[in-house]
């Protein structure tokens, strides 16, 4: 590996680190460290003595999962490649690398000392450093064709490309914009009907992987409105970060989901659409008008407003310089 490749790789690891920190994740230990392989025959790591510790960990993070009601640890592998260097075989190679690392990490005593036990989750962040050439449909084909062997103790790997990573950056930038004008902004986790009461409604400062890959991300906040020197009132504002195609059918489906956890119980609901959605403005405006007319007719004080997330072409430069 050339010095330039090493520099760009380290820079992307730093950017990945800051993206996840800005999403509220907690880092464990250092970046770019090795752990021993405990399954050398299966992982074929004993064939060369060039590297004593064959499994490298770019980043190790953890967060509390409201749906599972427990802390989980995630091994993050960050890859930085030109588009020509991203193929079905390279993505398969990256995936296998993460799987083998997790198999050995789950029983590693040093990681247990960091509070990371029974690690069974990974995040593979593959960034194409030629964003103008990146083909998301082709990348999705590569992911669909991955060969994943059945394991007695399952491992879950989330694979993110430019498409997902830039969406996360858009959320981060919008939340930074919102927080100075709002109080108590937190991401919202509805109760999970399928968990037999294990999961109750929750509000957290962080996003979990399930939400990060979801077409809808929910949040709640308050706005303090000062009426005069001595009097103020509080306005409840709910948020939906909307990444699906905003047709009337999709919007109606999304709202049918929110009814189950009373997300319309607020003074204002802001839907943050991803991009300007010019070609679907008719659908959006029609849906919002119908909803607001119904709320007014029913005597509800809720109003729906529209906002738009910027679609970024690259990861913001300041993400490579420490937490932004």
Predicted regions and their residues:
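Intrinsically disordered, low-complexity Ser/Thr/Pro/Gly-rich regulatory segments
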Residues: 1-56, 61-324
